[in-house]
């Protein structure tokens, strides 16, 4: 089937599921599939099979793959492990080559980056941080991660930012909880992620009674506010976009903005945290559109 628009394979690789899609150059989804994240062999195998079945009718128009994946990832193109998930705590997935199965099966360009860097790109192209030079995308859900864009390009250094593993100041009413990160205990991920919330209180925020909920929300917002002030001090972002389920509970965004402003104490010239700290403009599609942005990058390399 000849298509006037280019077609891209897009993979949003998460810790619980891989979302797969064929998307055309107008950002229209032509085919979508969900594959549980089990073992690499099973998950990547089923992902390849989906595209093998979905692609033939678009074969003349297909351009490239973009993979926005959980990490950590090796993003050094000079390394033989470029495109590998490295020392993840997720069982079965350490030292997994994510790129090669798609390259070998389809023989086309493939670009990979972290899920949060992908979402940061998507929000910068089409969403809440469009028009900014410096922006951050943060997800606070099962885990905690962030991606930074400077002049529209993700920061890569030794690897990529691991924002969830910075160590925050402890809330005075939260000193007894050791945190849940297997590497650092009380890092941002270990204290403020959805996993940490459930381990600390035995339930999600939206399952709590009002009094318990308000106290828990203020504690989590305290950590996110300190995180924001650190970001503002280090890289001066014009926009901090917060995704993930934790941010969608009642009053969380308002509490994070308020506590950020209180901690910043009017120090940062021109910093209006009501405008800087926002939810994704692309909503729940930021991750998949991140994979699409990476597919566009793969085509143009």
Curated annotation (Swiss-Prot):
Its EC number is 2.7.1.4. The keyword Zinc applies. The keyword Nucleotide-binding applies. InterPro entries: ATPase_NBD, Carb_Metab_Reg_Kinase/Isom, ROK, ROK_cs. Belongs to the ROK (NagC/XylR) family. GO terms for molecular function: ATP binding; fructokinase activity; metal ion binding. Zn(2+) binds at residues 165, 181, 184, 187. PANTHER family: FRUCTOKINASE, TRANSCRIPTIONAL REPRESSOR MPRA. Disulfide bonds: none annotated. It is an enzyme of class 2 (transferase). Inhibition by zinc ions. It catalyses: D-fructose + ATP = D-fructose 6-phosphate + ADP + H(+). It comes from Zymomonas mobilis subsp. mobilis (strain ATCC 31821 / ZM4 / CP4). This is Fructokinase. It comes from the Bacteria.
């Amino acid at each position: 089937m000849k298509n006037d628009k280019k077609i891209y394979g897009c993979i949003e690789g998460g810790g619980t599921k891989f979302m797969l899609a064929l998307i055309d150059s107008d950002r229209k989804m032509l085919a979508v599939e969900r594959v549980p994240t089990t073992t690499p062999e099973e998950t990547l195998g089923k992902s390849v099979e989906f595209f093998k079945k979905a692609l033939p009718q678009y074969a003349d128009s297909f351009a490239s793959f973009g993979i926005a994946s959980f990490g950590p990832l090796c993003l050094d193109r000079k390394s033989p492990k470029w495109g590998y998930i490295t020392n993840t705590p997720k069982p079965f997935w350490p030292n997994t080559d994510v790129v090669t199965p798609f390259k070998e099966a389809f023989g086309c360009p493939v670009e990979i980056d972290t899920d949060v860097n992908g979402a940061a790109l998507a929000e910068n192209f089409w969403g809440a941080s469009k028009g900014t030079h410096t922006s951050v995308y943060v997800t606070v859900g099962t885990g905690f991660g962030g991606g930074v864009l400077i002049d529209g390009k993700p920061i890569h250094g030794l690897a990529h930012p691991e924002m969830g593993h910075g160590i925050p100041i402890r809330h005075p009413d939260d000193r007894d909880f050791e945190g849940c990160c297997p590497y650092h205990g009380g890092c941002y991920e270990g204290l403020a992620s959805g996993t940490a919330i459930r381990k600390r209180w035995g339930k999600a925020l939206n399952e709590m009674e009002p009094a318990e909920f308000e106290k828990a929300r203020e504690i989590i917002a305290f950590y996110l506010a300190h995180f924001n002030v650190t970001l503002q001090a280090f890289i001066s972002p014009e926009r901090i976009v917060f995704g993930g389920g934790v941010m969608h509970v009642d009053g969380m965004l308002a509490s994070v903005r308020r506590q950020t402003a209180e901690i910043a104490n009017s120090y940062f010239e021109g910093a209006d945290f009501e405008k800087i700290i926002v939810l994704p403009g692309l909503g729940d599609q930021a991750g998949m559109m991140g994979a699409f942005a990476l597919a566009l990058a793969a085509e143009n390399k």
